[in-house]
Amino acid sequence: MPHSYPALSAEQKKELSDIALRIVTPGKGILAADESVGSMAKRLSQIGVENTEENRRLYRQVLFSADDRVKKCIGGVIFFHETLYQKDDNGVPFVRTIQDKGILVGIKVDKGVVPLAGTDGETTTQGLDGLLERCAQYKKDGADFAKWRCVLKISDRTPSALAILENANVLARYASICQQNGIVPIVEPEILPDGDHDLKRCQYVTEKVLAAVYKALSDHHVYLEGTLLKPNMVTPGHACPIKYSPEEIAMATVTALRRTVPPAVPGVTFLSGGQSEEEASLNLNAINRCPLPRPWALTFSYGRALQASALNAWRGQRDNAGAATEEFIKRAEMNGLAAQGRYEGSGDGGAAAQSLYIANHAY
């Protein structure tokens, strides 16, 4: 095998590694505020608010106006394209609002899932066309990391070898393109929680998918120290009759990661996958208390599980903005503790305990 020409200089590698480590500083995680216009329609309709650009801006402002308390628990915020170019009520760009808190700005760069022919309803993710140019522009506009989501589902016949291979290679192409532009790629192979499969089946599939992803990243010469992984936790399917404890979920999750994710990867930022706010915090806490060695930071990259209570408090009313922002800060602080294994539970049986599951979830 001939020696491959190094794709990145030592300076480029250092920049990528520094960005990745900053995002997953102990006790910090990611706010995923990258819901597409279509996803925001679902969120806003739940509270009876019209899905307009201005209402989306006002809602993002609720999250982004959080005070300096979030600095110690949020290391990065993932933006949607529209939000990257919006401003707050005072005319300050949202990007600057976030950067002024010492938080890094990320951008969702995929263009959604499309059917994968020759499979039983499986998908691949589009958006590689023009990605190089978009990454170069996003870097100029303040983004230091990116996110790309691939989706796999568990059934009797899925995920197929074809879907696993295709999605792993798409993620690797995306990661390589990001790194050439000084952007840290968050690699997100989400295995949906739809179905009645048990914990063991999800663990097996998660291991197979992650093994394929890291093989593809190696094939594409991706610099692992300058990446982050955004996987699902290993959980039973939503229709599974067996209930598992956070400790069982933690053991299955950490075992799957230990078997597949190289220690060179600086951090694993879990998606919440429709868990309730409280469940997502308790499971993350259990993962960080798991008695197995864990060479990576294990933290959060939550959307709904950081925002649900804030959204309910806001309800589209300017007068509620302050209270809604407080709800977001409270949840962010709880997850900051969970990322260190120091969360004791909120004892909140209310909104925070409500399932946020959406069948066949698409952003």
From Swiss-Prot:
Q: List residues, modification Phosphoserine.
A: 36, 39, 45
> Which InterPro entries does this entry report, sorted A to Z?
Aldolase_I_AS (IPR029768), Aldolase_TIM (IPR013785), FBA_I (IPR000741)
Q: Which Gene3D superfamilies match?
A: Aldolase class I (3.20.20.70)
A Pfam family assignment? Glycolytic
* Tree of life domain: Eukaryota
Residues given in the record as substrate binding sites: 56, 147
Residue list for modification Phosphotyrosine: 5
The EC number on file is: 4.1.2.13
The metabolic or biological pathway listed in the UniProt record of this protein is: Carbohydrate degradation; glycolysis; D-glyceraldehyde 3-phosphate and glycerone phosphate from D-glucose: step 4/4
- Site residues (Necessary for preference for fructose 1,6-bisphosphate over fructose 1-phosphate), renumbered to this chain: 363
**Gene Ontology CC annotations of this record:** mitochondrion
Residues carrying N6-acetyllysine: 111
Additional note from the record: In vertebrates, three forms of this ubiquitous glycolytic enzyme are found, aldolase A in muscle, aldolase B in liver and aldolase C in brain.
- Report the NCBIfam families cross-referenced here: FrucBisAld_I (NF033379)
Complex formation = Homotetramer. Interacts with ATP6V1E1.
- This chain belongs to which protein, by name? Fructose-bisphosphate aldolase C
Q: Which organism is it from?
A: Mus musculus (Mouse)
Give the encoding gene's name.
Aldoc
